[in-house]
């Protein structure tokens, strides 16, 4: 494991910690998309199905279990934990993932998986789904327009986690004994990173001018 992968994993954990602390301290989930969290739970469950039959390393196993449990706990806080759950607005967090994201990702997984077995299909599906899982969150923030400081830091940290994973892939391609090639993962990671760029742009402007982060609203989704 190289430094870029380690930093990426740390940033991913930090983003989860930021979100959970925001929920528990503020006692509300305004501006947080539970639909995005649910998509990530699907991503982790599909990708880490190998937990049941493959042991890579202690670190790998611990991280996989941590990601699954943490995202499940986050969903619990938003959906069920009072008083946080009382602030969840289902009418606003209404991106139709089951219509616009899951079916296309499933089709792509069938077209791009290496072999037609359950593990490879689920792994490919998880890559494509993660590449667009941020969309419900971005759409929700666009509707809300004014973004809380801690929420913006959560989204930025998520974007940085993915950016370091791309650096990890580049490093492995040039420095592994056998060049690391993962076309599906590369394309998925690139799509995911591109989706963050617009948010990064407005975040940088807000910081530069010392103003609150306010996103433009382009209509209903």
Swiss-Prot record:
Record-level GO BP terms: protein retention in ER lumen; protein transport; vesicle-mediated transport
Give the range the annotation lists for the signal sequence: none
Record-stated family: Belongs to the ERD2 family.
Q: Please identify the protein, giving its name as recorded.
A: ER lumen protein-retaining receptor
Protein transport as UniProt keyword: yes
Return any one Pfam family short name.
ER_lumen_recept
Subcellular location, principal: endoplasmic reticulum
> In this UniProt entry, which residues form the Lumenal topological domain(s)?
1-2, 53-61, 114-120, 172-183
**A GO-annotated cellular component:** cis-Golgi network
What ranges are annotated Cytoplasmic (topological domains)? 22-35, 81-99, 141-152, 204-221
């Amino acid at each position: 494991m190289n430094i870029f992968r380690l930093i990426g994993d740390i940033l991913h954990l930090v983003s989860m910690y930021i979100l959970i602390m925001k929920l528990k301290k503020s006692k509300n989930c305004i501006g947080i998309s539970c639909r995005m969290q649910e998509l990530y739970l699907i991503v982790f469950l599909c990708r880490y199905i190998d937990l049941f039959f493959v042991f890579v390393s202690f670190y790998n196993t611990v991280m996989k279990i941590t990601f699954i449990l943490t995202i499940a706990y986050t969903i619990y806080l938003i959906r069920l934990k009072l008083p946080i759950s009382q602030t969840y607005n289902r009418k606003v967090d209404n991106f139709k993932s089951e219509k616009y994201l899951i079916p296309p990702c499933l089709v792509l997984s069938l077209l791009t998986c290496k072999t037609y077995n359950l593990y490879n299909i689920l792994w490919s599906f998880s890559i494509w789904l993660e590449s667009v899982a941020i969309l419900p969150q971005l759409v929700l923030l666009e509707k809300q327009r004014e973004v809380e400081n801690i929420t913006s830091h959560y989204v930025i940290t998520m974007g940085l986690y993915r950016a370091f994973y791309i650096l990890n892939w580049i490093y492995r391609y040039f420095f592994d004994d056998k060049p690391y090639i993962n076309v599906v993962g590369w394309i998925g990671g690139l799509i995911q990173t591109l989706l963050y760029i617009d948010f990064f742009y407005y975040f940088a402007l807000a910081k530069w001018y010392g103003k609150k982060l306010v996103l433009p609203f382009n209509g209903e989704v």
